[in-house]
Amino acid sequence: MGSDWDEIKRLAADFQKAQLTSTLQKLSERNCVEIVTLLLEKQLLEVVFTNDGKEYITPDHLEREIQDELYANGGRANLVEVSRTLNVDLSRIVALAERIAAENPLVHLVLGQLIDEDYISHIAQEINEKLALRGEISISDLASQFDLPSEFLQQDVVEKHLGKIIKGRQDATNPRVFFTQAYIQRCKAKIRGALAAITRPTNVAVILQQINVQEKIFHSLLDEISPAGQVTSKLANAQYVPHIYAKTQADWVNSFYKQNSFLEYDAINKLGISDAKSYIRKQFPNEEFLFLKRVALGARLVELTVVTALNECSATKQYLDLTTILPSNLSEEDIEEVFSAIMAQKHSNPSNFVYLDSIVFSQPYLTELVQPCHALAEAQAKAAIDSGVYQQFIVEKTLAQKGNASFQDQDDDGKLDKRDERRKKASSGKAGGGAQGRETKTKSTKKHQRRSAAAQNDSDVEDDVQHQGSRGAGGGGGNKKTVKPLDLVKTADIEKLINASLQEEGLEHLAPSIAALYLNQLNQAALAKAQELYEATPQTNRRQTHAAIQDRINTLLIDIRLYEKGLKLFSHDTQTQLVKYLLKSLGNDICNELSLYVASECNLTVKNTSLNVDQRIKLAQECDAEYRSALLEQNKALNKSIDDFELATESVLKACSMIIKKVDKKKDRLLIADHKNKLQQQLLDCQEPALLLHLAALILFTTISGCILHASGKFVSAILQHIRGSLSDPQNDMLLRYHDLVLQVLQTAPESDDSKMAHEQLQIMQSKVVELAQNYTRASVSKAD
């Protein structure tokens, strides 16, 4: 049995040896390649070739090598470096890395890098050391240091190990910032110490610069510290105001207000308070203030001092000097503002007081002061009636009203004439050509009138305005006739009467202001008295009106005679048209004034002072027989010659007991010179091209001929043709060119390019035309030749 068992052991050993013994057969490289190729073709084997194709490796083995590289690099391996080290295509490495990260939760694939938990724990320790050293750290700093995404660092590193490896806490206001409790305590200590040492308002930025604490931490810890002060805001220019400073400010303001009952804004601003009004309201919530531009007055100062004094002033019918009851450092502007504010209150009556230079007068005091001036007003009214000044004023006003109505009719006639001219041009189809056929259209202008402005007034004197009488060119101005107000009482007279009473009170410096205050009232009283006296003396008024109209008619007849000399220099056809225009304008005025005078003498009521031919004929038929035939003949003469009209006018004047002044030819030259000067002044003020050419033509005609001319704008071409021989060729060419441009502007659309270009050329030539008209003399004709 023993030998059998030994045999069995031997056989077993042989068998085991046979099993353990391998039979190796060496294959050639070619055979190996063929075997692997065959396995690959039958998909029995998967390999990964190296970049040079000389080697290959199985994916599992490559995965182990990648993990080895991760371990060898300390837990963080860049896949690009791994690909270069293993000599394998990067796409294969990336695919296996993704599989490793997916299968192993302890490995992360971040931005082409494999990172394991060991590396994360390592950088968590570094972060903890840095946080302990600096006290505060942000994710952005860590991302820059470790070259890792901020989200990965915050979620998988810091927040994951916060409270474990990383000893710190997260900022509640900014989750990307972490700090240690010791750091917070240090910041609190710095802030508390800095704020405790401040005794005046300091900029927060300066404080942070000194203690080296971030602004966000400062504001977050400020409430926890509860400092003895307050921060104005969380903006960049915020200031810290310590309570001791605010208390000092409040004590000063309270003390000043208690002593003076008012506060100056400038004084409060000097304490470092920017909004003084808001501070006053906050400091004195139960007090009422009168807020002015520079100061704030307390209610007790206003009510107990100023209002009480004003009530006493009104009751005693005296005056009050506000500078004696208000603080001395208030300016006159402040005092006036105080008075205005008090008068604006509901319980005040502004009509009871008059404020002048810090002095408040009660109305009864001033009424008594100017009482003597009413007697002066009555005396001046009687003197105006006795001297005829008031009657002359009434006449001038009446004539001005008539002239304005006549001006309106002439303006309407001018518009009709222009429409007729446009229709004629449209039917003929001609736009001009040659100096003979040109017409210049101008605005309707004021008829010729020469008389000095006389003082006048009646019960409606407040409606009167400045009168500017002038010898205008025919059609040379479009302003309505107005009358200068009549001042019967002068400021100096009022001052003289009240000055004695004011000197006793030391208020003589206010005499001009008081006089100006009552001047209009006294003038109204004087004019009312004058009207009363005027109505009580109708016969005197009739004589004054008679004389005024007689002078006016004589003035107009002289004008017609002077204008007749000028128009006789033209051809027969042009002369006929000028005569018609002259009688239509000035002749019509003479007829109107005489008709209205006769109507007044016959006690006829005339509603409209601007009469046409039919109205005058109807009025003449209603008049007394002594006037009727003369007035009817005068109306007919308007369509005849100038001589016929003058004869008819003489008949009317004779019937009205008026005389015609003798002709004084010595004054003709002065009248012509005065007429020319006024034309030149109008030319300097004129900017409209058509009117400017019209005025220039009239001035040149007067200079060359020595005569004046009453002509509308349609006669400009005839005037230029008449003076052509007295001007040089360049001067004629310039006037002709200017005339053509005016026609072009009038005949084209205002917004067209041609019109704009013509306007520009007219502006360029305007100064030359004005200079020619202003400086041309008869001597210049010989010089030009």
Swiss-Prot record:
GO molecular function term, any single one: UFM1 ligase activity
Biological process terms in GO annotation: protein K69-linked ufmylation; regulation of proteasomal ubiquitin-dependent protein catabolic process; response to endoplasmic reticulum stress
GO terms for cellular component: endoplasmic reticulum membrane
- Spell out the InterPro entries in the cross-references: Ufl1 (IPR018611), Ufl1-like_C (IPR056761), Ufl1_dom (IPR056580), Ufl1_N (IPR056579)
Q: Where is this region: Disordered?
A: 404-482
Print the keywords alphabetically.
Answer: Transferase, Ubl conjugation pathway
Which principal EC class is assigned to this enzyme? transferase
Q: Give coiled-coil spans as residue ranges.
A: none
Entry EC number(s):
2.3.2.-
User: What role is this protein assigned?
Assistant: E3 UFM1-protein ligase that mediates ufmylation of target proteins.
| Assigned protein family | Belongs to the UFL1 family.
Name assigned to this protein: E3 UFM1-protein ligase 1 homolog
Species: Drosophila persimilis
- Specify the taxonomic lineage: Eukaryota, Metazoa, Ecdysozoa, Arthropoda, Hexapoda
